[in-house]
Amino acid sequence: MSTQYETQGYTINNAGRRLVVDPITRIEGHMRCEVNINDQNVITNAVSCGTMFRGLEIILQGRDPRDAWAFVERICGVCTGVHALASVYAIEDAIGIKVPDNANIIRNIMLATLWCHDHLVHFYQLAGMDWIDVLDALKADPRKTSELAQSLSSWPKSSPGYFFDVQNRLKKFVEGGQLGIFRNGYWGHPQYKLPPEANLMGFAHYLEALDFQREIVKIHAVFGGKNPHPNWIVGGMPCAINIDESGAVGAVNMERLNLVQSIITRTADFINNVMIPDALAIGQFNKPWSEIGTGLSDKCVLSYGAFPDIANDFGEKSLLMPGGAVINGDFNNVLPVDLVDPQQVQEFVDHAWYRYPNDQVGRHPFDGITDPWYNPGDVKGSDTNIQQLNEQERYSWIKAPRWRGNAMEVGPLARTLIAYHKGDAATVESVDRMMSALNLPLSGIQSTLGRILCRAHEAQWAAGKLQYFFDKLMTNLKNGNLATASTEKWEPTTWPTECRGVGFTEAPRGALGHWAAIRDGKIDLYQCVVPTTWNASPRDPKGQIGAYEAALMGTQMAIPDQPLEILRTLHSFDPCLACSTHVLGDDGSELIAVQVR
């Protein structure tokens, strides 16, 4: 039975052909997407489904709050560290712990490192192949590719011989008949607009980024012991520092600090001379995508803010990445965000596979309930092999968070819009320069292409902040300030009998909040509302659709059986649905085939 209704400026109509893409690949975790298209192949209904259950909130109940970071960090191995950071923030807020300046600086270095790493991996390894036609690169003239690359930047790997070697490697790979990770690409699709030389350049940089991303994360290994899942501690950072030539075996020394400086320099060089020019090249040949995939970005966006410049101060003046919320498209009125206010952040479950005492009412995370209830309702297929979801009922393992009752978009585009409209000078200069280079209006950033450009902007911004915070750290160390942790309130005997706190930051993918309540030294309640919970949310009791669903609305597909347009827009958000489980069919086989119906 078809249904039609109006919400958030869109007309939802589930009549017409139904296309199912399951799973969405080149993301973190497991995701399914279903859309309806009309006779003109325009998407008139979109359904986003998270196909796995996390449950760490349940696991944490009754545990030592000082250990929470180590559990929640395992939510994700890609955006590694951000959940641990939000967790230690939350526990410190609850107990009243103040961290040393160096701990705050090192935490910011860890976060900025992740931003650079994650945005590079997303741009090249996860989203890049939506824009770069790998097979078309075989048609390129390496000499012309060299001329193109040298016209864009001074990156040294740009000779004709270099691109000839890369092309030859690709040719041998293709002639071997095993395309591997490139096997399921829609090569030759009419939406691929880059010329062969730009495709060869992009593919070469894809390989370089794949290699270089291993170097960036060594900063995590220096200060956190390893990557993924570096070590943290409630009260600071677990890394002693010794800048003398002897003593303090195992501490971070000048050799390690010099390595960090070297990596920061090389990271900025790669982003400035490879990633930024590549992003602009993609934009130059794909300008129509500045009007596709707008979704909620011109209506409702949210950022908590991040990178406190002053230790233990999360106020507006301290956060180098501004926070705020915009609703109803009023960008002249960026609203303050209060994560303790029960009327602001609320999660709904009436279309998710969870239960509340009253499913029609949202709950603030401090009153949050994680009660899984897998009940797909009236679907085509079986409970373990769903052929078509029923969006009128429950259809996702993701709750529906709302800010003051509004579905919101979070992530680089949301952050950039909020920082821009709050007058952040660096953001205004960077965005204006990008859009001017592409001869596009500012509104063009509110799009699928805009999300790609905003990640490039943020990578460059984060690389600059890496140097800023490293310089601050070195100044402290040279002045004899070596403290990296406070143990004043380490023992539970120093804690209140009951307390609660909230920790927030901005993960590469968007606004991240952890809420914790402690009773008698143990975790009594723990709730996480993560970026993809916001963006991939299902419908709520008012029928509002989430950011993914909204961004797909109105998209015209050139070849419905090759849903490149769907992948471009979904990948522009960099979905992260956590990677700890697999989805199995009735016979135990893993469901890995992409199906379009």
Regions found by a protein language model. Name each.
Residues S2-R597:
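Metal/cofactor-centered catalytic core regions of large enzymes
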